[in-house]
Amino acid sequence: CNGVFAIRYGLECIDADPMDIGIPHFHNCLDSNNGGIVNSMLKHIKLGFGNTTEFLSYDIRQGRVTREEAIKLVKELDGRCHPRYIEDYCYWIDITVDEFWTVANSFRGNMWELDTDSVWRLKNPIWKQVPFNDNIDIYEVIDRIDSRRVALEKSQHSPR
């Protein structure tokens, strides 16, 4: 993967909790704390899936995760974005957080519905369609596919 290659040659990745950034692959959030993280959340709002779904589909095909593990990670991570990243992004582009949400929600796809608690929920998420083990430890899976660790292992076993 390009991320592993770049890390082997000195790229430093974000140091963040995946629950805050909504992405299990740290090499996706490089240039700043706001652009990539907020973009992934906006993708989720508009299309109903974010970078977690996209990246894990590749990981499934490469045999790095099982479909069941991917479903658990998608359920827990896809679309997550800590409010501080949204606030930083709004400051960066000089709008209010309310303006941000007005625009973001205007692009929300029809796969969403507003529940009785006024929380947006996917109408038919994969974790309600396919049985899976909801007790999977997402941090164990994230650690196993962490591109920083993979890059370190590859650099120890092969010359640059």
Regions found by a protein language model. Name each.
Residues 1-160:
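Nucleotide-activated chemistry modules centered on ATP-dependent adenylation/adenylyltransferase
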